[in-house]
Amino acid sequence: YIGDERFLPAGHKDRNDQTINEIWLDNSPIPKKNIHFIKAELGLLEARVEYENTLKKNDKFDVVLLSMGEDGHIASLFPGHKYPENRSVIIEKKSPKIPRQRLSMSYKQLNKSTYVFKIILGQPKRQAISLIFQGYDLPINRVCGEVEKIFIHSSAIPVGGEQ
């Protein structure tokens, strides 16, 4: 299951499904029937309903793997944005990143997991890491499942007095 998708035409080079297929799944033994992408090309509302129905077939994830954006966002859940708490898939219409419209699993859905692994890489993430250590409420902090493991590459760890 994919956590989010950009609202772009099928096959567009900037869609998450394209990148995931090229880098990983095209060369993977995972059966295609076990791979579930968000069909953004259906339109925002239709794609949300379709993916919510897909997610209903699997009540809980064994593992959720998350990476974090420079601002502390995960999937397409951004700092300072309010999302419906009763949905498993949300529509983001004002993403601070292009494209503005996206579909994403909700916090509620991502938390339906036994294990949540968070991977944080790169110097541009240092400010967000600093905010996390200071207790700021960032999207990355809102998903933890039953067991949470955080992997922070040394390049992302603030050094000296960095804030």
Feature-to-residue mapping (PLM):
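Ligand-binding beta-strand-loop-alpha-helix segment within the catalytic cores
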Residues: 1-65
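Solvent-exposed alpha-helices and their adjacent loops that cap or buttress functional pockets
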Residues: 29, 56-58, 66, 70, ...
